[in-house]
Amino acid sequence: MPQSTIPSLFLLIFSLLTSLNTALADASTALVAMEDSQNPLIRISTSKGEMYLELYPLEAPNNVENFIALAEGEKEFTNLKTGEPIQSRYYNGMRFHRVVPGFIIQAGSPAINPLGLQVSLLNDEINANALGLDQIPALNPDGSFADVLNIESKPDFHEEILTPLYSQRNITDVEAALSRQYQVLETLQELSVKSVYENQGYRYDDSLESRPIERGTVALANSGPDSNGSEFFISLTAAEWLWGKYTVIGKVVEGQEVMDSIGNTAIDPGQFSSLSTLIYSVRKAN
């Protein structure tokens, strides 16, 4: 070997060892930061760096199992072009396609899966009582709505509270609404936040533990009750108006600086952006 190549070869080996040690240190730090080292630890490698997620299999067993199976390539799909069965690590090559700075970063939509892979939907796994939603009145004494409901306008009130309540009470026309308006008013005064969500179709499981959505929480995106699939989001802040409506599956325990870096640039989910963060891989780290 020429003498001149020895320093460059040494630098290459040193660089590889350093990067390996850094990765090991990150995983080691993540394990220390975990609430329970027996829980699954997931590494998300992205173009902005790595994040480590601790998952909560006892709190959302079916949805955590599904997330891991998608990440590890354990699910069998059908190739839409050939009709042949295919197994693929679902999240590899996807992007954080929706970013709202100061709020959430979101990825995993079947609509933008590189292979067009579609997933089955699972039920929610949420305990509203554990979140205290059964103890929060929907109406405040001054007639305003509980902050957690995030009711900001009359259309919000009709869509989120009144229409579901009318449906639940089988009130189908204006005449019925007028004749039962005092009954409806009494019901409104007795509603808890949990009851509001139940009228919207959410169902809860008191046997599970549930956590609030806080900074770093990993939860499943949905289009309404019992519509959990592959899409997930990481919250950049506490978001009490999401409690009871989204199944929490874990938390970022290492790499929050990467999470924040991804969250610095707004990304519109309706159009592709080269500024969106690429996901290299999602896989178990323990």
Regions found by a protein language model. Give the residues of each.
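Bacterial N-terminal signal peptides
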Residues: 8-19
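Cyclophilin-like peptidyl-prolyl cis-trans isomerases
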Residues: 20-286
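Positively charged n-region of N-terminal signal peptides that target proteins for export
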Residues: 1-7
